[in-house]
Regions:
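Membrane-interface loop-to-helix entry segments
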Residues: 120, 133-181, 193-196, 234-235, ...
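C-terminal membrane-solvent junction of multi-pass transporters and transport-like membrane proteins
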Residues: 159, 320-327, 370-419
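Membrane-interface "cap" regions at the ends of multi-pass membrane proteins
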Residues: 1-40, 44-50, 63-68, 79-80, ...
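Helix-loop-helix junctions that connect adjacent transmembrane segments
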Residues: 4-13, 49, 53-56, 128-136, ...
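TM-loop-TM module centered on a large, flexible mid-protein loop between adjacent transmembrane helices
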Residues: 85-86, 92, 124-129, 233-300, ...
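Hydrophobic transmembrane alpha-helices that form the core helical bundles
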Residues: 41-43, 64-142, 146-150, 155, ...
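A generic transmembrane alpha-helix motif of multi-pass inner-membrane proteins
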Residues: 361-366, 395-458
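Transmembrane helix-loop boundary segments of multi-pass membrane transporters
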Residues: 43-48, 118-134, 154-163, 283, ...
Length: 458
């Protein structure tokens, strides 16, 4: 999520971020609307209140390990392409292009549909539209905001900052009302049927909520005295995130209980309804819908740039890469992206749990490429032993090995504990393999898949 010629651009590096700036940006990148939906799915996959809180702490520690590995890669190989560039250097252009396909067809479109479902779940709290209301809201929101982006829109970093403030404000409200509000204590949680609990599945939803840490690692390129400060930034940011998420989940647990969480599709609204009445539920639902609208708009805006760049790298479907000069947008890419996202919404509507289906759709592909990036760090260390490393991951090779083992387990869990949506995601990834036959022969290895004439400023 995150320039017009498909060439490498060398720029004069400027270091503008203080340690405080970087911590604030990291927290802003990671804190998102997932925390208002995933707790119920985590609760459904753990056996006890202790395990429910423990997985959120574990998720934060895994986030820190991954961010430290990414910090070395982004410092040693600074480039706007991120994972695309790392994969190009470690494995060659075909693997990187397959990642570009995966990002455009699975990861980004799945994220769009997932955000739309969160929007739909909370919009349905305000104006119910029946059992398929969340899916209907999700589809309408994708169509509306794709149309807005086709016409052309200005992305404002101040708008994104405001939305982050709303999200953190909603979390703060959950914590304050949950810990200090008055409500009848929830009943003890019923035992799950044997075999129902799956820590691996719970961790998938937890780590989704912590998503954004891989973007935070790219702060290395703009951080003052990065070799000394990046680890401190990542550790402090992670501690803040763990505190935010653990406090929010303790608050939710204290009001709704484990069974109440398991039964809820809108945990923040249901919690506020118990401690502050319908007015409280309405206010927090409006705040989350507004934040979801902003997130959805930004995700749609950046996602279509992937299709634009893929068309620049491939000879197939060149019209997808056409830039609409009138609206200053990749209109065809936006339309294709919306079609794929709407198909995913339809799949989610059939399963009757759209957000969960979107997580299952994207998780195996996401964790598979994350594993390749982790292995790539070791590959590049071995292949380029004399390369200057502005920042070195601590406890090498233990830290990247631990990261790779975690990614491998998450890849296994995302296939073993999920439904048919995960197989659909893997099938879509496999369908992209023949497209490599249509790649342009003179594209530069450094070309990122998110290259576009106008980048999102967040």
């Amino acid at each position: 999520m995150h320039q017009p010629q498909v060439t490498r651009v060398d720029t004069v590096q400027t270091y503008t971020l203080t340690r405080f700036d970087a911590v604030v940006i990291m927290v802003g990148l990671v804190v998102g609307i997932g925390i208002f939906r995933t707790p119920s799915l985590v609760a459904a996959n753990v056996e006890s209140e202790f395990a429910f809180i423990a997985v959120w702490v574990a998720g934060g520690l895994i986030t820190l390990i991954g961010a430290l590995c990414y910090a070395e890669l982004s410092a040693a190989h600074p480039h706007a392409g991120g994972e695309y560039h790392f994969l190009s250097r470690a494995y060659g252009k075909p693997v990187a292009m397959l990642f570009g396909w995966a990002r455009g067809s699975v990861i980004q479109t799945g994220a769009i549909a997932g955000v739309a479902f969160v929007l739909g779940d909370y919009a349905a709290q305000l104006v119910p539209l029946g059992p398929y209301g969340p899916s209907l809201y999700a589809a309408i929101s994708i169509i509306v905001f794709t149309g807005i982006n086709v016409v052309g829109t200005i992305q404002s970093k101040f708008l994104q900052i405001a939305m982050t403030a709303i999200e953190i404000g909603a979390i703060a409200a959950i914590v304050l009302f949950g810990l200090f509000g008055s409500a009848e204590p929830p009943p003890p949680a019923a035992a799950l049927p044997p075999g129902s609990a799956a820590i691996g599945m719970a961790m998938i939803f937890v780590l989704l909520t912590y998503g954004g840490w891989n973007e935070a690692a790219y702060l290395t390129g703009e951080l003052k005295d990065a070799p000394r400060n990046i680890a401190k930034v990542l550790m402090l940011g992670t501690v803040i995130l763990i505190a935010l998420y653990v406090l929010a989940n303790v608050a939710l647990l204290s009001i709704l209980g484990l069974d109440g969480l398991r039964a809820s599709d809108a945990v923040a609204a249901d919690m506020m309804r118990r401690v502050a009445g319908p007015a409280g539920a309405t206010i927090v639902s409006i705040a989350i819908v507004v934040a979801a609208i902003s997130t959805l708009n930004a995700t749609i805006f950046t996602g279509a740039r992937v299709y634009y760049a893929m068309a620049r790298d491939m000879t197939l479907l060149p019209s997808v890469g056409e830039w609409n000069e009138r609206g200053k947008t990749p209109a065809n890419g936006l339309i294709l992206q919306a079609i794929v996202a709407l198909i995913l919404v339809a799949i989610g509507a059939i399963t009757r749990d759209g957000f969960k289906a979107m997580v299952e759709y994207t998780a195996p592909v996401f964790w598979g490429f994350l594993l390749l990036v982790g292995i790539g760090l070791i590959v590049l260390r071995i292949r380029e032993p004399n390369r200057a490393l502005p920042y070195k991951v601590p406890l090498y090779p233990l830290t990247p090995i631990l990261f790779c083992v975690t990614c491998g387990y998450m890849l296994h869990a995302s296939i073993a504990y999920t439904g048919v949506a995960s197989l659909v995601g893997l099938a879509v990834l496999a369908a992209g393999t023949p497209l490599l036959l249509f790649r342009r022969k003179h594209t530069n290895v450094d070309t990122p898949p998110s290259t576009a004439p106008r980048a999102l400023t967040e």
